[in-house]
C-alpha cells in the first residue's frame, strides 16, 4: 500500500510538471504566432515596395536625354541594389518563416504528446485510486474477520475455563463421596461382623430347634440385612458415587477432545496414542482400585 501511495504521489507530481510545461509551450507558441504575423506583415510591405519600385523603374526606362538620363541610370542602379537587398531580405524572411513553421510543428507535436501523456496519467491515477479503495475495503473486511475469530476464541476459552472449574468442583465432591462410601463400607463390614456374631450365638442357643425354623430365621435375617432402610440408603449412595465416577471422566474427556480438535487436529492421534501408555494404565489401576475394594467388600455385583 505504501508503494501504491508513493507511485500515486509521483504521478501527481509528473502531472503538475506536465501542466507547467504545457503552459510554457502555449506561451511560447503565442509569442511565435505574434512574431510570424509581424514577419508576414513586413513581407507584405516589402512586396508592396518592390512593386512600387518596379513601377518607378518602368517609368524611368523611358528615353531620357543628357544629364536626366545619367541621373535616371543612377537612380535605376540604386533601385536595383535596393531590390537585390529586398530580395535577399525576402529570402531571409522566408527562411526564418520556414524555421518558425518547423518550430510550430514541433511544439504542436510536443503539446499533443504531453496532452496524451496527461490523459494517460489521469487514467492511471484513477485506476490506482480504485485499487487503493479496493485494498482498503479488503483490509477492513480482514480486520473484521480477525476480530470475530478472536472473540470466538475468547468465548471458547472462557467456556473451557468454566467447564474446568466445574470439573474441579465435581472432583472435590467425588473425593468427599468416595471417603463417605469407604466409611459406610467400613461401618457395613462392622455391622455385618456384629450380626454374624449374634447369629452364631443364636444358633448355639437354638441348636435344638427344627431345621425348618432355622431356614426361616436365616431368610428373615437376610431380608432384614439387605432389604432394610439403612442398607438401601448405602446402596443408593454407592450407585450415585459410581454414576459420578463414570460421568465426570467422560465429560472431562469430551471437553478436552473438543478443545484439542479446535486448536490442533493433528494432536488427537498423538493424544489417543498416549492413552495406551504404561503410565496411563498405572493411573487407571490406581483410580479403579477403590472400586475393586468395594467389590471385594460385597458392595458391587460380581
From Swiss-Prot:
A GO-annotated cellular component: membrane
InterPro entries: SMCO2/5, TMEM191B/C
Protein keywords: Coiled coil, Membrane, Transmembrane, Transmembrane helix
Entry similarity comment: Belongs to the TMEM191 family.
Name used for this protein in its record: Transmembrane protein 191C
Main location: membrane
Coiled coil ranges: 5-160
Topology with respect to the bilayer: Single-pass membrane protein
Location within or outside the cell: Membrane
Chain residue ranges for the region called Disordered: 1-21, 54-73
Positions of transmembrane segments: 238-258
